[in-house]
Amino acid sequence: MAGAGGQHHPPGAAGGAAAGAGAAVTSAAASAGPGEDSSDSEAEQEGPQKLIRKVSTSGQIRTKTSIKEGQLLKQTSSFQRWKKRYFKLRGRTLYYAKDSKSLIFDEVDLSDASVAEASTKNANNSFTIITPFRRLMLCAENRKEMEDWISSLKSVQTREPYEVAQFNVEHFSGMHNWYACSHARPTFCNVCRESLSGVTSHGLSCEVCKFKAHKRCAVRATNNCKWTTLASIGKDIIEDEDGVAMPHQWLEGNLPVSAKCAVCDKTCGSVLRLQDWKCLWCKTMVHTACKDLYHPICPLGQCKVSIIPPIALNSTDSDGFCRATFSFCVSPLLVFVNSKSGDNQGVKFLRRFKQLLNPAQVFDLMNGGPHLGLRLFQKFDNFRILVCGGDGSVGWVLSEIDKLNLNKQCQLGVLPLGTGNDLARVLGWGGSYDDDTQLPQILEKLERASTKMLDRWSIMTYELKLPPKASLLPGPPEASEEFYMTIYEDSVATHLTKILNSDEHAVVISSAKTLCETVKDFVAKVEKTYDKTLENAVVADAVASKCSVLNEKLEQLLQALHTDSQAAPVLPGLSPLIVEEDAVESSSEESLGESKEQLGDDVTKPSSQKAVKPREIMLRANSLKKAVRQVIEEAGKVMDDPTVHPCEPANQSSDYDSTETDESKEEAKDDGAKESITVKTAPRSPDARASYGHSQTDSVPGPAVAASKENLPVLNTRIICPGLRAGLAASIAGSSIINKMLLANIDPFGATPFIDPDLDSVDGYSEKCVMNNYFGIGLDAKISLEFNNKREEHPEKCRSRTKNLMWYGVLGTRELLQRSYKNLEQRVQLECDGQYIPLPSLQGIAVLNIPSYAGGTNFWGGTKEDDIFAAPSFDDKILEVVAIFDSMQMAVSRVIKLQHHRIAQCRTVKITIFGDEGVPVQVDGEAWVQPPGIIKIVHKNRAQMLTRDRAFESTLKSWEDKQKCDSGKPVLRTHLYIHHAIDLATEEVSQMQLCSQAAEELITRICDAATIHCLLEQELAHAVNACSHALNKANPRCPESLTRDTATEIAINVKALYNETESLLVGRVPLQLESPHEERVSNALHSVEVELQKLTEIPWLYYILHPNEDEEPPMDCTKRNNRSTVFRIVPKFKKEKVQKQKTSSQPVQKWGTEEVAAWLDLLNLGEYKDIFIRHDIRGAELLHLERRDLKDLGIPKVGHVKRILQGIKELGRSTPQSEV
């Protein structure tokens, strides 16, 4: 699958998309989440306002220096059509005309202009130039060109020289990056503070800091966008003895509906006006009055591990790149987003990452590539990279990492936005991702990810015109001498098989005679050929010598057969000796004599005399086969010798022989004893896992190989499906002499190898690309190539993953009928680790590095190790090679794990393309036509990849849930009240001192009583120790040094001691103390209660001492969400108890304004006390207030109105009817 998303409709097609934008805005805004920007286009035609047209001549323009010029599409006012115009930016004026040679140019003054993108997704790369007199909607060919124009227009505004900069100028100038959008709730302009126009609040929003503005106000907005460097912070920087610290960066207004103040935990924000503040980094929200009370140092929020703080970018290198201070960055994250991926969803993710992180660490791959970002991070010892895109985007970044040699410094994660996303599936990040609101959770998972190594492979190519392979059907007898050689090979293989396996004496004698004649003719033909083609007498003599040895071995075989014909037949009971002889012969011919003597000692002499004859025949047959091999090897050396020039090139291809003998077919299907009684092949690496249930008699033992992952055998030479096995055996018929002679011993891929003397040598090759996922040649590459071509021609048809998969299905179905590469085995030759692989009839070959192919298919057919192959893995330096028979197989493999098409597991792959025409090839979804020549796949390096660790995430989540259940709600809420080193006011210090004295008195009385009552010590020891430890933290000699964090800890512990002591003395089963001790403890307990009640008058301590009194108390975590009436009774009784304690002094009818204000405090609505006091609302008036009265008082929030009405209703129930 292609890695990057498709290019979207060209600007010429944008008119249709923009025409319906006005109708789409309202519906989209209604469906958008609260507080979120709509993703629909804001394409607007120029307003009907009158303007004075200013023109200039080409001569006047020529005198000015051009900053940027080129063709753009301009939207006209008539039906929003697009017309091509030529634009020139010179000075602070933009000129445009029909073409560059026009004499008259329209001009637009940019003195008070602002620039904004046209929409959230911005599929057509359009942008708007907004001036006080007009709006100009323009459209670029691609996103990079659009951003270049926007940057140049902004540089005019700041009077800075425009450059195709290393970084966008707005990232370092504080300028906002506008785009047009609509909103689902009332939104206010941060410039004029008025609401944005329209039902859906049309306006401009900064893509980084979400600063809102009218289109007319954007030009007056201050350059206070999100900070990127230390210089951009300015006077807000915090300096202390440890150096500089990161301050909060506050943005006013437009808070979400659920906003709560981090200081007082009350709701903040408003839909009626621009009020309250939000930090752009830690996302903390506070009231205007509480902002100064909040800790000034910003903790950077949920994503702090991934963020590079602006204070860390404090200097510049000589080459213009920012230098980071490493002490501020533990494991920073570098983000690359392909803005074209996922139907232009990448634009949305690009903006969201800039809002979460430092904008200087987020880069668009479509605007400059990955080089700039990697240069910024290259001096970090360790950093992480997140690539948001498809497999092509990942490959692009990995290739740039290779160029800068950063493999050891960085780990790379993937967020799947492309079509196939095979690598993301394997790494555990899924096959697709569309929800940009969940990015904080993704960053959190990325911080917990583990690292694995990914093998990367170089695709080396060497273009060379090679003669086409021979035809499938042999030519007429007089066509070539190769035809006669094929006849000899068939005859020798057939008659050797009959001699060794036949039980009929007449058949053996007849085959021996025919074999004798065939070998003699073969020797004569070889000698005749070499006499004609070779001028080197030494070489000719060597070949002649080998031929004489062949004749000698043939005579010895015939002599053994003649002797055997006079002996008695072998008894059936001696057949195991022949099988054992086969096992002995698999070792070496030299050891055959010793084994023969050893076997002879284990049996009786008569039996030995009868068994020697078959063993001798087998020995002679092997000797004859060895002699034939030596003739062929000698001929091969001659053909490889550069000093020898034969008349015709050697044909090393394996031809399809339709006249295969019945005997050879029988041998190809047989897995039994016939296959084991054979001759030896050329040396080959042993493979213990490759056994197929019989002796490996076809290999000579090599050096011992350690059973480790690094020393795995280089080739697995077995397959499973008998059908493919038979096809391979058939394909060998008509091949080289060695293959013919070994046909009786064939295993599926056990033909004689053409060993590459140096498998890793790539001299003369050029690196075409690097493979991370998979390589394909033939059918699948042709489908990928056609899809890529169609996407380039009609990008509007390939905008989503679903459409892309449908197109792949259509193209695959077409190939099911066309079968364009049904004879691919005739055009290519496959070698694995230097071993020549004879191919069956197929349409394609796939080489897999990861167990995911073409959008999630496990094309290898399994993930576990079996008796034949090792488990596939992307970190074992081993490739999996599979055959592609047709497109139906590719479709079926998506739902069924097929295994019959496996070919081999190896460390290098070599594919030779014959003929004059190229063959389609694809790597990781990127396809091209490869000219004839050689393709070599060799290991390049390994990359560190971040894989999702679901087991660790599950364990950590269970632990966090347990901590939440154990700690309870008050402890969970304490993080909102960490005020660090803020000193207390004088009144607050005195109140804390009184409370501490009361707590010390209570501890003293408890200790005195515990000397007599041991149970009291057991029950209260923990609370007493915790309270004493908190009180000791406060310095009694210097009470003014108390800080809020110390006061908070004291208050919490004193409250806990009070609760436990009270429950022990006046609980359901009270502890009976002696009279004096009980009285003293009760008096001390009452004093603590009084002091705690005074502490609740301090606003920031009230919600710590009375956390959420209107909610149910903490219970079992599994039942917290249970809203049944059984659990609502408890808080209701609790509220009535508190209410009676504080209002029982007098009836509601006699309440004054102070009692009403206290009642509002009980409802957590103290912000309305001033309104009630100002309108002199007393108890009698309070009982008769209705909804419309509350609205007239200026209470805007519906939830607050409902809470007040519910409280009034409860007051009415508790008040006697006579009083009302």
Curated annotation (Swiss-Prot):
PROSITE patterns: DAGK, PH_DOMAIN, SAM_DOMAIN, ZF_DAG_PE_1, ZF_DAG_PE_2. The keyword Zinc applies. Pathway: Lipid metabolism; glycerolipid metabolism. Residues 20-35 have a biased composition (Low complexity). This is Diacylglycerol kinase eta. It catalyses: a 1,2-diacyl-sn-glycerol + ATP = a 1,2-diacyl-sn-glycero-3-phosphate + ADP + H(+); 1,2-di-(9Z-octadecenoyl)-sn-glycerol + ATP = 1,2-di-(9Z-octadecenoyl)-sn-glycero-3-phosphate + ADP + H(+). A motif (PDZ-binding) lies at residues 1218-1220. Belongs to the eukaryotic diacylglycerol kinase family. Residues 593-604 have a biased composition (Basic and acidic residues). It comes from Homo sapiens (Human). Phosphorylated. Phosphorylation does not inhibit catalytic activity. Its main location: cytoplasm. Its EC number is 2.7.1.107. Residues 581-592 have a biased composition (Acidic residues). Residues 1-60, 581-617, 636-705 are annotated as: Disordered. Keywords: ATP-binding, Cell membrane, Cytoplasm, Kinase, Lipid metabolism, Membrane, Metal-binding, Nucleotide-binding, Phosphoprotein, Repeat, Transferase, Zinc, Zinc-finger. Residues 1151-1214 form the SAM domain. It comes from the Eukaryota. One of its GO terms (biological process) is phospholipase C-activating G protein-coupled receptor signaling pathway. GO terms for cellular component: actin cytoskeleton; cytoplasm; endosome; intracellular membrane-bounded organelle; plasma membrane; protein-containing complex. Residues 328-463 form the DAGKc domain. A zinc finger (Phorbol-ester/DAG-type) spans 175-225, 247-298.
